[in-house]
Amino acid sequence: MDYLLDVHTHTIASGHAYNTIMEMAKAGFDKGLKLLGITEHAPMMPGTCHAMYFHNLKVVPRTMCGIELMLGAELNILDYDGHIDLDTRVLKQLDLKIASLHSVCIQPGTRKENTQAVLGAIHNPLVDIIGHPDDGIYPLEYEPIVEAAKETNTLLEVNNNSLNPAGSRKHTRENLIAMLELCKEYKQPVIMNSDSHVFCDVARRDFSGVEVVISSKDGEVLPLVPAVIGLNLFNAIIYISPIL
């Protein structure tokens, strides 16, 4: 299966990543991507860039090293109402916006509170993707999240880093399977991203591949199927998973 885009990556601007925009673009081109999204951590993440950085992204070319770029932010969900940490004026200037739960920005709450936080972000019309909705420290009710994502044309992410055995997120495999079962039922597209913080991880999907993420109830491994969802968000291939 061709992997044409990876729209959740970070550069040195995020404070805990290790390569420049150009180095990440070259890595994406070398791996055959058509589109690379760079989404720096928004300002409430410790060590990341100031809001002015995002405002000034307009000066950066959208084609580099032979690959198309989308430049945006991984926003932090800040409270159980789903507020995020860039204002509307800046958000409207960005190519894409991912909203995610991070423990340095919001403490885990009850399942109801965590779900409300994600739903608040989904219902923000400027949010395009919910990032890594799989971390077990934030228990979630997936059915209302999938329903709201379908209603608002918001993509849910299958995050390669989440399934890395060396990673810090908990119970990600079972959470993703639960989410993807509902995505199939509701015909809700999901998007596969690397969440790369270093050039060599761009376009990686080894942990989020079929062998790891998707299996039927009797253990049979089923493939991810590429589906073109019109223009949708990126005018590219989005992945929807038949998992039952």
Region spans (language model):
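Extended substrate/RNA-proximal surfaces in nucleic-acid metabolism proteins
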Residues: 2, 42-158, 162, 214, ...
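Histidine-centered catalytic micro-motifs
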Residues: 4-14, 38, 130-133, 196
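Active-site mouth loops of central-metabolism enzymes
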Residues: 7-19, 102-109
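Histidine/acidic-residue-rich catalytic or RNA/ligand-binding cores of hydrolases
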Residues: 15-18, 48, 139-146, 166-180, ...
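Anion (oxyanion) recognition and catalysis
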Residues: 29, 149-150, 184
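Short acidic/histidine-rich active-site segments
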Residues: 188-202
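Mid-to-C-terminal alpha-helical segments outside catalytic/metal-binding sites
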Residues: 203-244
